Amino acid sequence: ISLAQIKKLLQIIKQGLKAICDNRDLIAKGCQA
């Protein structure tokens, strides 16, 4: 696995977590911390 692939995976994970946080008000407060 190349460094570029790792960075891409991390970006996808971050976007996924952000989407979850945006969809759940209670969790959103914790995710912004």
UniProtKB/Swiss-Prot annotation:
The record's comment on protein family reads: Belongs to the myrmexin family.
Which species? Pseudomyrmex triplarinus
- Name assigned to this protein: U1-pseudomyrmecitoxin-Pt1 subunit LS2
What keywords are assigned to this protein? Disulfide bond, Secreted
Instruction: Tell me where on the tree of life, at the top rank, the source sits.
Output: Eukaryota
Q: Which GO terms describe its cellular component?
A: extracellular region
User: What else is on record for this protein?
Assistant: There are 6 heterodimeric myrmexins which consist of a small subunit (SS1 or SS2 or SS3) disulfide-linked to a larger, quite structurally unrelated subunit (LS1 or LS2).
Function according to Swiss-Prot or TrEMBL:
This heterodimer may have anti-inflammatory properties, since the myrmexin complex (composed of 6 SS-LS heterodimers) inhibits carrageenin-induced edema in a dose-dependent manner (after subcutaneous injection into rats).
**Protein's UniProt keywords contain Signal:** no
Q: What is its main location?
A: secreted
Quaternary structure note:
Heterodimer composed of subunit LS2 and subunit SS1, heterodimer composed of subunit LS2 and SS2, and heterodimer composed of subunit LS2 and SS3; disulfide-linked.
Task: Cite the record's tissue specificity text.
Answer: Expressed by the venom gland.
Tell whether Cell membrane is among the UniProt keywords: no
State the organism's lineage: Eukaryota, Metazoa, Ecdysozoa, Arthropoda, Hexapoda
Q: Where in the cell is it found?
A: Secreted
